[in-house]
Amino acid sequence: MSEFSQTVPELVAWARKNDFSISLPVDRLSFLLAVATLNGERLDGEMSEGELVDAFRHVSDAFEQTSETIGVRANNAINDMVRQRLLNRFTSEQAEGNAIYRLTPLGIGITDYYIRQREFSTLRLSMQLSIVAGELKRAADAAEEGGDEFHWHRNVYAPLKYSVAEIFDSIDLTQRLMDEQQQQVKDDIAQLLNKDWRAAISSCELLLSETSGTLRELQDTLEAAGDKLQANLLRIQDATMTHDDLHFVDRLVFDLQSKLDRIISWGQQSIDLWIGYDRHVHKFIRTAIDMDKNRVFAQRLRQSVQTYFDEPWALTYANADRLLDMRDEEMVLRDEEVTGELPEDLEYEEFNEIREQLAAIIEEQLAVYKTRQVPLDLGLVVREYLSQYPRARHFDVARIVIDQAVRLGVAQADFTGLPAKWQPINDYGAKVQAHVIDKY
């Protein structure tokens, strides 16, 4: 997030000195949200004490609280929010008793978290990324032009620090809010499945698909602009390499690169985690259906029998011929009728016979390594054999070669516990992982 210039002890001492504290029970938080909502409808952003009392009255009615002490409780709530720096109070000698109230940055931040930031908008994210791209391009152009220290502060450092970094923080906040929404969706799905999983399947599917779509939309938007943003950051970084006095710009660019990498990386990781959860839910539903279908059928049958006299029913069944009534014996009996007698050159040779012949040949050829005590590199040997056979036979031939090779001896490197390197054995992507056999 944003960079802090103070140390932890300084911040702790500062908070203790100013007696900062926030206490917002659900009714007070609702009051603050009501104030923020009504305040957003006003052009001047100001509210009188009477308007605050009216807002408190709506909240009090919603919580079914007594109306006899509305004035006192509203006054206490307003004073408490002023004390907690959620509201600013402005009084005037000309209008004594008619104070004006405005939300503080803290109050706006809290209400934004609960109201405005909850809504994900691809258009908003696209606009933010468009603004960032424009700012980065102008900063990169200014960096390549070069200039004095004022030029670097004004045209490079300032846009990066006060525009690009803040928008990156806003995007990061959006991702963190999406994390909370995912957790809320998981809780909703758990509650639905615990109540009645059969009725909840459609609702679960809707929640899963909506969340997956939102995450994918967010990530696609980020990835589409990510390369261009990184390219402009690299341009600025290249321009600062020849200046020893621009460490502050170089450090800021490095921080922005780290933020952008973290944002894009977490977006993809969040999608992967959600896909795993999606599969877990579907597996649970399938398991529940498999376990429950027999019980449900028995229950419905029992209920139908019990209510037969009130709701009579008829059972109709059909005994159709089997569509797949074919057996190996029947095929063998009809084999001669279909194929007739074949010449000896076209007689079918079973694969087992071919395998035995091939294994004997390979065993005889590999025995040379044992006789001469020459190390046997499986990767090279298998590749040499596969080059002599068509692609369709590669798997079977490779298995035979490996089976015969491991009978000759072992690799001393196997006892080190270190994995062997993967070696390609054909031109189609097949690989083998094995140490060189050197002990027969």
UniProtKB/Swiss-Prot annotation:
Molecular function via GO: calcium ion binding
Leader sequence segment: none
InterPro entries (alphabetical): Chromosome_partition_MukF, MukF_C, MukF_C_sf, MukF_M, MukF_M_sp, MukF_WHTH, WH-like_DNA-bd_sf, WH_DNA-bd_sf
UniProt keyword Calcium present: yes
GO cellular component, one term: nucleoid
One GO term of the biological process aspect: chromosome segregation
Location(s), subcellular: Cytoplasm, Nucleoid
Keywords assigned: Calcium, Cell cycle, Cell division, Chromosome partition, Cytoplasm, DNA condensation
Region (Leucine-zipper): 208-236
Main localisation: cytoplasm
Superkingdom classification of source: Bacteria
Cytoplasm found in the keyword field: yes
HAMAP family according to UniProt: MukF (MF_01803)
Similarity comment: Belongs to the MukF family.
The protein's role, per its UniProt record: Involved in chromosome condensation, segregation and cell cycle progression. May participate in facilitating chromosome segregation by condensation DNA from both sides of a centrally located replisome during cell division. Not required for mini-F plasmid partitioning. Probably acts via its interaction with MukB and MukE. Overexpression results in anucleate cells. It has a calcium binding activity.
Protein name per UniProt: Chromosome partition protein MukF
Source organism phylogeny: Bacteria, Pseudomonadati, Pseudomonadota, Gammaproteobacteria, Enterobacterales
Name of the gene encoding the protein in the UniProt record: mukF
